[in-house]
Amino acid sequence: RKSHNMNVVQIVSHFDLGGAERIAINIAKSKESDINYHMIEVVRGSSNFSRDYMKELETAGIKYYRSPFTNSKMGIVFFPIRLIALIKKVCPIAIHTHTEIPDLSLYWTCLLAPRIMQDIKIVRTLHNTVLWNKWKSIGRVVEKFMQKHKANISTSNMITCTYQKEFGF
């Protein structure tokens, strides 16, 4: 590792208004003395809230990495290049995803470069009772991947129960 501190990369859809983004920043601001958090967005946030979000990251001393893509599909397709570069730079012990776009983006990265994730723990927070509204078939594949990696943690019992009914485990 490049430092004595452990690095954790959190992936969010975009630096913008959202419950998952709020949870991610709160985790990163938790001030674990031996953990450095890095935040990366899949799709470029461009609202006034995005500017406030990045200012909050800066104030808290959290490193963040912007997406050059405002289109979701382009952001997902090219995300592996960005994540692989970040992994090589910071050598994270864990990668933590928040919601479906980050989940799919990490899965895509692992398909393209499986060995890069070999020693990295995958953590995934379930934030919603309904997942994969528009991409059910893709969701089933990504869910098997997340279950295989024992990555799932939930923000509530209701979310856990709904998830188990929909995807098993």
Where are these regions (language model features)?
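Membrane-proximal helix-turn-helix segments that form the acceptor-binding/catalytic region
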Residues: 81-85, 135-152
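N-terminal strand-loop element at the rim of the active site
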Residues: 10-73
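Proline-aspartate-enriched helix->loop->beta-strand connector
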Residues: 87, 91-93
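Extreme N-terminal starter segment of soluble prokaryotic enzymes
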Residues: 5-9
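Short His-centered aromatic/hydrophobic patch
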Residues: 97-105, 126
